[in-house]
Amino acid sequence: LGTRPLRTAKATDTWVLAGPAEEVLEPSLTLHGFRYAEVRGVPDLRAEDIELVVVGTDLRRTGWFSSSHALLDQLHENVVWSTRGNFVDLPTDCPQRDERLGWTGDTQIFGPTATFLYDTTGLLCSWLTDLAAEQLPDGAVPHVIPDVNRNSLSSTPAAAWGDAATIVPWTLYQRTGDLEVLERQLPSMRAWVDRIATLAGPDRLWIGGFQYGDWLDPTAPPEDPFGAKVDPDVVATAHLARSSWILAESARLLGHDDEAEKYRILNQEVRAAFAHAFVTPAGRVLSDAQTVYALAIAWDLLPHEHQRQAAGRRLADLVRAAGFRIATGFVGTPLVCDALTATGQLDVAYRLLLQTQCPSWLYPVTMGATTIWERWDSMRPDGSINPGEMTSFNHYALGAVADWLHRTVAGLAPAAPGYRALVVRPQPTAELTRAAARHLSPYGEASVAWERADGRLHLTVHVPVGATAEVYVPGSPAPERVGHGEHRWDVPDPCAAQVLAGSSIPN
């Protein structure tokens, strides 16, 4: 068994038999995350004598995805299993080693995916209550909630991790339409933004201090998970911009106009400072890495359209130069495909998604993974385990790309909080013949399915009662607005030219 990644966790149950009578071992005060187990001391033990019991919070399944690509479907299934294995009373980072903690960064990164797949509202609202309770008087957010570490490092403000205070409530509002989530969390959100704005000072740049940065990007050495290519100051200032925008919007929605204006101005100042300090007039971003372009594009940190388009082209060039291999860590991974899509680089996004060589989303699948790994190479191509300390085999953060599968590959996304309005915008590729997603929204089941066959694209959309949808049919000049019910389109296959040209996804 590969137990080294467990670190100090023994992950061992010892049972002393009382006598010859039949006994059942089922520990009730612990749980173990594992794929393989070893049993000793039981003669004539058969596989059928052992029953594996899945432990997790009993969350209602609300989201599904499928496609014609077997590896892609297995990736999505791995995301589902990592969600099940880590949402146990609270959103943990991993279920097996000597942590099993509610890491804030992991939770906010994975939030959009988790809230599509399962009804996590109750669990995450409870966790946010704990976050607010654990928040320090100065507004700093501990790195794990509940804060079992309680040391000076764990309460040092860290970008992306502490920003769970703003991003998770905003994600829940977007998925449920429930303003009470924002109302309850607004003091916590405000305290966090005020704290990091103070750290940034009058120049509005969050510089220095402790940062995780783009945690565990592929260039980080096994012994140095902090060793990402991206300048942590870029990551930190980008998150100050994001959180101040969320706070301003939340205050506006709740009718706190003066507060909304205050944080709107802060957001404008941070965005201007980011552009001045980190972006060239031609659209190059400091560190010149996939993650910084993903952040700048996805979070609207580039003041001019020509910079945005140049950044998209540069991001695509970096992906090509890497052989269509991923080069992002925890921070950039949820955003990189969106950034490529938003700047007209959909073909590059698909080639990145469907890459099977290491590092990539599908590489672990080719190695037999059944959950999402903490590192892109938790297992090396030769079958050896990465020697680094951070080598979990069930860690959902890098699976955040599933949100892009739902919204872009299948094409199902909320256009208004709580799915009161849907945007259906499937973006097919020649590499897939079909894709589908469905979600149990507050209004009922919404679904999208498309299939390419015989030179045609067949699109089926189901809109629940009480909701509407804006449908972007591939090849059509304008979207169509539809009400509840099932709607079908049969149009020319937009990928037919790619197929005739012999399109493929090379490694």
Role assignments for model-derived ranges:
Residues 264-265, 347-507:
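Non-catalytic C-terminal accessory modules of carbohydrate-active enzymes
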Residues 75-78, 120-131, 179-197, 250-275, ...:
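Extended, well-ordered alpha-helical scaffold segments
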Residues 321-367:
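Repeat-solenoid scaffold signature
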Residues 26-29, 40, 105-135, 166-182, ...:
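Alpha-helical support elements that line or immediately flank enzyme active sites
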Residues 76, 80, 219-229, 376-391:
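Surface-exposed acidic, glycine/proline-enriched linker/cap segments
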Residues 4, 10-13, 19, 92-94, ...:
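The feature captures the catalytic groove of carbohydrate-active enzymes
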Residues 1-97, 105-106, 122-125, 138, ...:
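Extracellular/oxidizing-compartment recognition motifs
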